[in-house]
From Swiss-Prot:
Protein name (record): UDP-N-acetylglucosamine--N-acetylmuramyl-(pentapeptide) pyrophosphoryl-undecaprenol N-acetylglucosamine transferase
GO cellular component: plasma membrane
Lineage start: Bacteria, Pseudomonadati, Pseudomonadota, Gammaproteobacteria, Pseudomonadales
Gene that this sequence comes from: murG
First-listed, main subcellular location of the protein, grouped into a coarse class: membrane
Keyword Cell inner membrane: yes
GO molecular function, one term: undecaprenyldiphospho-muramoylpentapeptide beta-N-acetylglucosaminyltransferase activity
Length: 356
């Protein structure tokens, strides 16, 4: 294999999945990919399963920590930077690419100290703490949404790397003569407010207008959610997980979900209209900013959790289900926002920096 590239990403799938897509692209171009993570994040399952070598450093966040932890923070940071620098000196990568998570801060600083160019990719419309702090040290900044880094002269709007199979080419069958299909996504852990809200809302939609329902309720939430639908008199298929998202998106005409960065990018890739209920406690309210990206272009409805009740959601569902042409217009708007070249664009940017 060729020269080494070091990817830094950890903690959640929102950071790790785009990084994995880029890792595959680097490999396709002949590079050897190494990964810098932490001992506890989701990367410990996903990265080895992808056949990549995972190097770990001890890195933790600072938000919400007590005074003792904050006093220890400078020493912990020095330790994690030292660990990362030792790994970087051994691997001698041509570039280091940070996708977010606690590992990105010390890893990026170590790369800068070692003279290795750093590239940052931010998935959300509002930059995470680690990426925000790393930007001054970065040779190039890739943003998924326009104007995330308005003060950076080195930014490039690339979009979020999304699996190629989610870019659906086949047009959906017309709604004439059939029921609409509603996909509800609660995430792997489940979004309990959505699990409670949707059965109540759908019960208030006229039976002849009510869509077919597929509800992904999350681990340990499927049985109680299915019971809520039964109690509400609404037919629904409820599952804890969805293994094949391409199939699920291809089935759906409309999606109700949270507004994580990857979800937003996947909805655009699949050309799907949506009703977005951002997680109200997300750091810096970044999900609302993510959702606004689709909403202001007419591809989604932004429905804040604090002000959206069952009657509000039922009214909105009724409105769009009575206007199939509205759903099609929203689908076209979503498709216009898709970034099918995002993975290639991020990797191109990295290699321009590495070999420029």
């Amino acid at each position: 294999m060729g020269a080494n590239v070091l990817i830094m990403a950890g903690g959640t799938g929102g950071h790790v999945f785009p990084a994995l897509a880029c890792a595959r692209e680097f490999q396709a171009r002949g590079y050897t990919v190494h990964w810098l993570g932490t001992p506890r994040g989701i990367e410990n399952d996903l990265v080895p399963a992808a056949g990549l070598e995972l190097h770990r450093i001890n890195a933790t966040g600072l938000r919400g920590k007590g005074k003792l932890s904050l006093l220890k923070a400078p020493f912990m940071l020095l330790k994690s930077v030292w660990q990362a620098r030792a790994i970087i000196r051994r691997l001698r990568p041509v570039c280091v690419v940070g996708f977010g998570g606690y590992v990105t801060g010390p890893g990026g600083l170590a790369a800068k100290l070692a003279g290795v160019p750093v590239i940052v990719h931010e998935q959300n419309a509002v930059a995470g703490t680690a990426n925000r702090l790393l930007v001054p040290f970065a040779a190039r900044v890739c943003e998924a949404f326009p104007d995330t880094f308005t003060l950076s002269d080195s930014r490039r709007t690339t979009g979020n790397p999304v699996r190629s199979e989610l870019f659906l080419e086949t047009p959906r069958p017309a709604l004439a003569g059939r029921k609409a299909r509603l996909l509800i996504l609660g995430g792997s852990l489940g979004a309990e407010p959505l699990n409670k809200l949707l059965p109540e809302a759908l019960a208030q939609v006229a039976a002849d207008l009510r869509p077919e329902v597929f509800h992904q309720a999350g681990r340990n939430h499927d049985e109680v959610t299915a019971e809520r639908y039964r109690a509400a008199g609404v037919d629904a298929q409820v599952q804890p997980f969805i293994k094949d998202m391409a199939q699920a998106y291809g089935w759906a005409d409309l999606v109700v979900c949270r507004a994580g960065a990857l979800t937003i990018s996947e909805l655009a890739a699949a050309g799907l209209p949506s009703m977005l209920v951002p997680l109200p406690h997300a750091i810096d309210d970044h999900q609302t900013r993510n959702a606004d990206y689709l909403a202001r272009e007419g591809a989604a409805f932004l429905m804040p959790q604090r002000t959206t009740g069952a009657a509000d959601l039922a009214a909105r569902l009724t409105e769009v289900l009575m206007q199939p042409q509205r759903l099609e217009q929203m689908a076209q708007a979503a498709r216009r926002l898709a970034k099918p070249e995002a993975t290639r664009s991020v990797v191109d940017t990295c290699l321009e920096v590495a070999h420029g």
